[in-house]
């Protein structure tokens, strides 16, 4: 099967045709997964009342934990036109464009590692779809809690990148803006050779985590949940990768083991003859 075989570049051979076939397969998997993700996420949009009630639960929990920082953070940012523009820019251009760029970089820089991060993204996306369907949450910008949508007030670029018809308005929990940027940051830090690449990997998820909160698109707990799901998905993808890489070695060791020698034939019995 092409999908099963396509997990490792070396399994496709060294010819240019084999490599093109590999990357066409990988591109098809990623594009297909994104289409399915947006399609299913849109279909699982919950009711406004349920989403608002769940959002209230999250805000109450944050208050009890003393981490309800969204109002103070946004007030600080909106009072500075420069900070607000930076936050909006990070939210708009720091998500899908960055994901595409990092995956493309991995495809060239470390093809075998590319599939690891791609699989982690697919696993976390599947978990997210289940949560979106069973626990819809309205973002702060849609509630009457004194927070404003800074992104759409100052720019319409985000609506071009993610048209409203493809967006589930009640998919605040978890935040994959923060989670998937964390995954891309981990990839840059672990796979990058240059210092500036690793620095970008460290700054990127922090900037996005702050951005999603100050733009009123997510709660702080959404960021925590997104990060936890992505880290768990990466751990699972790593475990599956290790098992797959060990399997050929185990088979080879069995094949190389010499077959046991046949048991020696029993010695012929002596026949005693009586002297004549």
Q: What kind of feature is each model-predicted range?
A:
Residues 2-10, 238-251:
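Membrane-interface capping segments at transmembrane-helix boundaries
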Residues 48-57, 107-197, 244-274:
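Membrane-interface loops
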Residues 89-104, 126, 177-182:
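Hydrophobic alpha-helical transmembrane segments
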Residues 21, 25, 29, 115-120, ...:
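Alpha-helical transmembrane segments of integral membrane proteins
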Residues 185-190, 230-238:
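Hydrophobic transmembrane alpha-helices
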Residues 1-97:
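N-terminal transmembrane-helix/juxtamembrane module of multi-pass inner/ER membrane proteins
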Residues 139-146, 168-172, 207-233:
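Interfacial helix-loop-helix junctions of multi-pass membrane proteins
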Residues 35-39, 125-133, 203-216:
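Aromatic-anchored segments of alpha-helical transmembrane domains
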């Amino acid at each position: 099967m092409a999908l099963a075989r396509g997990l490792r570049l070396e399994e496709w051979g060294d010819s240019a045709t084999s490599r093109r076939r590999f990357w066409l397969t990988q591109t098809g998997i990623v594009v297909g997964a994104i289409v399915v993700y947006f399609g299913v996420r849109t279909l699982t949009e919950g009711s406004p009342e349920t989403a608002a009630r769940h959002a209230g639960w999250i805000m109450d929990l944050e208050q009890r934990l003393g981490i309800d920082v969204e109002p103070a953070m946004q007030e600080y940012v909106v009072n500075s036109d420069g900070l607000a523009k930076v936050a909006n820019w990070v939210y708009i251009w720091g998500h899908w464009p960055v994901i595409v760029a990092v995956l493309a970089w991995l495809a060239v820089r470390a093809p075998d590692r590319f599939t690891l991060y791609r699989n982690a993204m697919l696993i976390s996306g599947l978990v997210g779809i289940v949560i979106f369907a069973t626990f819809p949450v309205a973002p702060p910008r849609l509630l009457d809690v004194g927070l404003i949508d800074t992104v759409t007030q100052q720019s319409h670029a985000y609506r071009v990148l993610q048209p409203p018809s493809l967006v589930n308005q009640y998919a605040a929990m978890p935040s994959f803006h923060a989670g998937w940027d964390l995954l891309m940051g981990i990839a840059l830090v672990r796979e990058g050779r240059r210092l500036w690449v690793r620095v970008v990997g460290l700054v990127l998820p922090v900037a996005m985590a702050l951005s999603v909160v100050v733009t009123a698109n997510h709660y702080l707990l959404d960021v925590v949940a997104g990060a936890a799901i992505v880290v768990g998905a990466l751990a699972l993808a790593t475990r599956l990768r290790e098992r797959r890489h060990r399997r050929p070695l185990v088979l080879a060791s069995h094949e190389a083991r010499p077959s046991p020698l046949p048991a020696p034939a029993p010695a012929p019995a002596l026949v005693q003859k009586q002297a004549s």
